[in-house]
Amino acid sequence: MIWALVNDLGQRAVSLNKWEQRRSLRRRLQTLALPPGSKALDFGCGTGLFASTFSRSGLTYHGYDIDSGVVSYARRMYPGQVFASAREEIAHYGPFDLVVANCCFHHIPDDVLAEELEWVKRILADRGAFLLIDIVVRPEDRSVLRRAFRTLERGAFLRRAEEYVAIVARHLVVKRVGEDRSYMLSIPGSPVYNDLVVVECGK
């Protein structure tokens, strides 16, 4: 629980409470134009930092993370929301109209991702949407500041944009691929940022 608290406070401090990322996610959720009350799954939800963003967008929120410690913390932080660390428990609430994997795939190796994506496909509604947002590695980027910023994510499996797309395309139908940036302290135009890939898929 202490680690979950430290992780939560650290992320909020570095990103000014995820202000910029919340705004970007809210815009993407609005673009999907899902009916009010649609069931959304926050895959790899961590401490539930984006729970309120989903709810304020009119969606019924569910958070899933394999780390039972952060899930316990999230339940205390957002007592009105559903959080689970077991597949069986969260699948009970499906099928989901939307599954969002927001900056968590860079913590997962390819073979495990294949299993997770097959599971996502099973719990996704027939006309549901899957949205991947994740940090991309750019070997040509020599910025010491940006490299240091990326290390804060502690992800052992950062990939190129095309590698994320290829992995997802083996399991789901890729509809759109875009790019975005996540700036340190949520300051647009700052030289310290993470490049992101955004992949929208159907079943």
List each model region and its residues.
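Class I (Rossmann-like) S-adenosyl-L-methionine-dependent methyltransferase catalytic domain
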Residues: 1-37, 46-92, 108-112, 119, ...
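Conserved acidic residues
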Residues: 38, 97
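Conserved beta-strand/loop positions that form the S-adenosyl-L-methionine
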Residues: 43
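A conserved beta-strand element that flanks and buttresses the S-adenosyl-L-methionine
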Residues: 100
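Short catalytic micro-motifs in class I SAM-dependent methyltransferases
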Residues: 103-107
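A short glycine-rich, Lys/Arg-flanked "PGG" loop and its adjoining helix->strand segment in the class I
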Residues: 114-126
